[in-house]
Design a protein with these regions (language model features):
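Acidic, small-residue rich beta-repeat scaffolds with periodic aromatic anchors
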Residues: 1-5, 93-164
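Short, surface-exposed coil-to-beta transition loops
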Residues: 47, 55-58, 77-78, 98-103
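Long amphipathic alpha-helical scaffold regions
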Residues: 69-92
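Acidic/hydrophobic-patterned starts of short beta strands in beta-sheet-rich repeat architectures
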Residues: 42-53, 86-94
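Well-ordered beta-strand positions
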Residues: 52-53, 62, 83-85, 107
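Repeated scaffold domains used in trafficking and secretory/extracellular systems
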Residues: 35, 76-84, 125-129
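Terminal domain-start segments
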Residues: 1-43, 150-164
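Beta-propeller blade repeat segments, especially FG-GAP/WD-type strand-to-loop junctions
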Residues: 58-72, 106-110
Length: 164
């Protein structure tokens, strides 16, 4: 009747330390019924994880026999997506927010979801009215070189997963 309490471990709205702590988010039975379920191998171990895509979150579960373990939920919006590289152990969520692009790379190992890194770029206004890019890696400004190598490692060459 009242739904169940789903604990969100990662919230892509927030880069800070609180994002890892997460907060309880009530997922109603209606949202669960309306949600779309996908089965994908996100970590290259040849076992498919269960992804419940509800209105605001992608919720990840592992299944072993008849046991189901909730790994976490990641906040999504319309322009977001997920890429995955075949045998790679990581998968990357990307979020587009106006002039900002954020990437969140996760790994699932032994049924535990951990954040590998976050990186992104942001278009800024210079004092002379021109535009320039600022790059970030794990919440800190970084060089163009570091950003490009991280981008190549995690965000290119993978296939985009359809969550619809």
């Amino acid at each position: 009747k009242s739904g169940f309490q789903m604990y969100v471990k990662y919230d892509a709205e927030d880069f800070g330390a609180d994002a890892e702590a997460g907060y309880p988010s009530l997922l109603s039975a209606q949202k669960i019924r309306d949600g779309r379920i996908k089965y994908m191998d996100l970590n290259g171990d040849r076992k498919k994880e269960c992804i419940l895509v509800t209105e605001d979150y992608i919720n990840l579960f592992t299944m072993k026999g008849n046991k189901v373990k909730y790994l976490g939920g990641i906040h999504i919006s319309y322009m977001d997506g997920v890429t995955h590289k075949g045998k790679a152990k990581e998968f990357t969520f990307f979020r587009y927010g106006g002039r900002m692009m954020h990437y969140y790379t996760f790994r699932i190992k032994n049924a535990i979801l951990t954040k590998v890194c976050t990186f992104g770029d942001q278009v800024m206004d210079a004092s002379d009215g021109s535009l320039y890019n600022e790059y970030y890696y794990n919440d800190k400004r970084t060089s163009t070189k570091k950003y490009k190598s991280t981008y190549r490692r995690y965000a290119t060459g993978g296939k985009e997963l359809s969550l619809g």
